[in-house]
């Protein structure tokens, strides 16, 4: 790739935290740039130190950090990197967050609870971020929490493209894991050729994390290949329960597709044994060998992130990269 797109009046610099170096290198390769060298380490008490090895004055900085477990460690590292760039006189700082942490805490379910997703946005702004690039937020309203531009990218085109190429049979139905994601499921159904929809009616106890009671399937899934979608898979309990419900209703193959593979224990074991034909996620988060299983397919989100970074750098349109809301 040439540097024809580079605006000589500015200097694009890519910075990466230590949480997901493989993704950072993939993005750098797509952009034909290098990840800026830095010294990042912990002191004995766990405090994080970061120093960049070259001048950042006047640069257009993109700070890439995923937030797998331990989430707070990697989030704090990104905040410290942003602060260092601000104090080093970077011209503009964009926080590239493939997976936005604390996104499930986007509203108060009961009294005396925090809205942690808003707090994260405030912390990023205070640290010095001018802009956020992220992928498939848990809810769209989080875009409004940040006082600045938010480029909310979608993994849908990547995932639906893979499904179209590998499952050409038209006898398919898109299944939303709950009624709240039906609008997104409609977009999936259109992308897969106008296939029908179904959804899982479920209840959740807000006092018990990672626990959902799946009740019944609404829609006709008998004999069909079911594409069960979600934004993330954490412990896998919800999605595994949904697979069982679909099979009980006579579904054929069940394909699970989600953007974020959090895969907290015991997700790998649950997904491997739940009866799904394939589990498709992207690499917004690192997925170690201990979390992999035969049915798992991991697609690279790097081309989408790189295209977004390039568009932001050129002050171009991000909306043209996908059919979304950026």
Curated annotation (Swiss-Prot):
SMART domains reported in the protein's UniProt record: Pribosyltran_N
Residues annotated for Mg(2+) 1 binding in this entry: 138
Source superkingdom: Bacteria
Residues spanning the signal sequence: none
Essential cofactor(s): Mg(2+)
Active-site annotation: 202
Activity regulation annotation text: Activated by inorganic phosphate, and to a lesser extent by sulfate ions. In addition to form a complex with ATP, Mg(2+) also acts as a cofactor. Strongly inhibited by ADP and GDP through competitive binding at the activation site and at a specific allosteric site. Competitively inhibited by Ca(2+), Cu(2+) and Fe(2+).
Keyword entries, A-Z: Allosteric enzyme, ATP-binding, Cell wall biogenesis/degradation, Cytoplasm, Isopeptide bond, Kinase, Magnesium, Manganese, Metal-binding, Nucleotide biosynthesis, Nucleotide-binding, Transferase, Ubl conjugation
Functional pH dependence: Optimum pH is close to 8. Activities at pH 7 and pH 9.5 are 57% and 70% of the maximal activity, respectively.
GO molecular function, one term: magnesium ion binding
Linked residues for Isoglutamyl lysine isopeptide (Lys-Gln) (interchain with Q-Cter in protein Pup): 29
Subcellular location per the Swiss-Prot or TrEMBL entry: Cytoplasm
GO biological process per UniProt: 5-phosphoribose 1-diphosphate biosynthetic process; capsule polysaccharide biosynthetic process; cell wall organization; purine nucleotide biosynthetic process; ribonucleoside monophosphate biosynthetic process
Pathways involved: Metabolic intermediate biosynthesis; 5-phospho-alpha-D-ribose 1-diphosphate biosynthesis; 5-phospho-alpha-D-ribose 1-diphosphate from D-ribose 5-phosphate (route I): step 1/1; Cell wall biogenesis; cell wall polysaccharide biosynthesis
GO cellular component: cytoplasm; peptidoglycan-based cell wall; plasma membrane; ribose phosphate diphosphokinase complex
Record-stated family: Belongs to the ribose-phosphate pyrophosphokinase family. Class I subfamily.
PANTHER family, per database record: RIBOSE-PHOSPHATE DIPHOSPHOKINASE FAMILY MEMBER (PTHR10210), RIBOSE-PHOSPHATE PYROPHOSPHOKINASE 1, CHLOROPLASTIC (PTHR10210:SF41)
Descriptive protein name: Ribose-phosphate pyrophosphokinase
Organism of origin: Mycobacterium tuberculosis (strain ATCC 25618 / H37Rv)
């Amino acid at each position: 790739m040439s540097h024809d797109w580079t605006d000589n009046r500015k200097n694009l610099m890519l910075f990466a935290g230590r949480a997901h170096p493989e993704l950072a290198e993939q993005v750098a390769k797509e952009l034909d740039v290098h990840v800026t060298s830095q010294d990042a380490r912990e002191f004995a008490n766990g405090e994080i130190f970061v120093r960049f090895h070259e001048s950042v004055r006047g640069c257009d900085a993109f700070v890439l950090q995923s937030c797998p477990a331990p989430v707070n460690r990697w989030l704090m590292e990104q905040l410290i990197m942003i602060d260092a760039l601000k104090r080093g006189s970077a011209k503009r700082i964009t926080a590239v967050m493939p997976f936005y942490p604390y996104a499930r805490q986007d509203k108060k379910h009961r009294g005396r609870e925090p809205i942690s997703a808003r707090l994260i946005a405030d912390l990023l702004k205070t640290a010095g971020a001018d802009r956020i690039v992220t992928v498939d937020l848990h809810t769209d309203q989080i875009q409004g929490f940040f006082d600045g531009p938010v480029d909310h990218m979608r993994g849908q085109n990547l995932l639906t493209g893979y499904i179209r190429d590998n499952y050409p049979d038209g006898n398919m139905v898109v299944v939303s894991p709950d009624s709240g994601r039906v609008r997104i499921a409609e977009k999936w159904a259109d992308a897969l050729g106008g296939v029908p929809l179904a959804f899982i009616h479920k209840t959740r106890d807000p006092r018990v994390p990672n626990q959902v009671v799946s009740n019944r399937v609404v829609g006709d899934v008998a004999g069909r290949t079911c594409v069960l979608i979600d934004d993330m898979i954490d412990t896998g309990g919800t999605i595994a329960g949904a697979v069982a419900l679909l099979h009980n209703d006579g579904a054929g193959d069940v394909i699970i597709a989600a953007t974020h593979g959090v895969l907290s224990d015991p997700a790998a074991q649950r997904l491997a044994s739940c009866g799904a034909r394939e589990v498709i996620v992207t690499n917004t988060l690192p997925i170690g060998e201990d979390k992999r299983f035969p049915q798992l397919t991991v697609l690279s989100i790097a081309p989408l992130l790189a295209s977004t970074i390039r568009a932001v750098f050129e002050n171009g349109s991000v909306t043209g990269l996908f059919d979304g809301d950026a």
